[in-house]
Curated annotation (Swiss-Prot):
Keywords: Blood coagulation cascade activating toxin, Disulfide bond, Hemostasis impairing toxin, Hydrolase, Ion channel impairing toxin, Potassium channel impairing toxin, Protease, Secreted, Serine protease, Toxin, Voltage-gated potassium channel impairing toxin. Inhibited by Cu(2+) and, to a lesser extent, by Zn(2+) and Ba(2+). Not inhibited by Ca(2+) and Mg(2+). This is Thrombin-like enzyme collinein-1. Belongs to the peptidase S1 family. Snake venom subfamily. Residues 1-229 form the Peptidase S1 domain. It is found in: Secreted. The record marks R79 as: Pharmacophore that directly interacts to Kv10.1/KCNH1/EAG1 channel selectivity filter. Thermostable. Activity is stable after incubation at 100 degrees Celsius for 30 minutes.
Length: 238
């Protein structure tokens, strides 16, 4: 996160860290949505992932942290009227449930859609400088604004974003505050509700008039809930 501050150790007990297992390199953030399931971005997927839960400072072994592996991974494969922008979402079932503690608790799914103009909280262990990468040991947090989707369409003509999409646009138009590389997969929390997943942005982060794109959790609720419930048929949204 660019332009943020170290998160309060008590404000991110649902935030998980995804690592590539063999290289032990940090990949992405993710969000614990119940004891057995994590929601993150599809572009964070690797063949061998290790998931740390209950971590603050990545450089020290925290006695209460828990390590898990994906038991199953689910991708949003609906074909009708969907583009790659709609599909940057991955649901991971953990190999065994985590135990809740003061530093481990789930973030509930949203009960209502997000409202443009909301102030949203972002957090992650992503780079705090851009374009050169400086990864912090502790997660950084910042507040950004939920913007009209058209702002992102205008800001990123090279992406050729479709007219209607299950994606959110958020940032600070003056620049200086933004999610960035390796914040991917982490949450966008608007008015206290888990509304977005860090997805894509401009190569150099936090530029003026270049807000970033977030997968819209609310529009994927049926898909998420059906999978968690063990439904054999996962209904694609219309």
């Amino acid at each position: 996160v660019i332009g943020g501050d170290e998160c309060n150790i008590n404000e991110h007990n649902f935030l998980v860290a995804l690592y590539e297992y063999w290289s032990q390199s940090f990949l992405c953030g993710g969000t614990l949505i119940n004891g057995e399931w994590v929601l993150t971005a599809a572009h964070c997927d690797r063949k061998h992932i290790l998931i740390y839960v209950g971590v603050h400072d990545r450089s020290v072994q925290f006695d209460k942290e828990q390590r898990r592996f994906p038991k199953e991974k689910y991708f949003f494969n609906c074909r009708n009227n969907f583009t790659k922008w709609d599909k940057d979402i991955m649901l991971i079932r953990l190999n065994k449930p985590v135990s809740y503690s003061e530093h481990i608790a789930p973030l509930s799914l949203p009960s209502s859609p997000p409202i443009v103009g909301s102030v949203c909280r972002v957090m992650g262990w992503g780079t705090i400088k851009s374009p050169q990468e400086t990864l912090p040991d502790v997660p950084h947090c910042a507040n950004i604004n939920l913007l009209d989707y058209e702002v992102c369409r205008t800001a990123h003509p090279q992406f050729r974003l479709p007219a209607t999409i299950r994606i959110l646009c958020a940032g600070v138009l003056e620049g200086g505050i933004d999610t960035c590389h390796r914040d991917s997969g982490g949450p966008l929390i608007c008015n206290g509700e888990f509304q977005g997943i860090v997805s894509w942005g401009d190569g150099s982060c936090a530029q003026p008039d270049k807000p970033a794109l977030y997968s819209k959790v609310f529009d994927h609720l049926d898909w998420i809930q059906n999978i968690i419930a063990g439904s054999e048929t996962v209904n694609c949204p219309s």
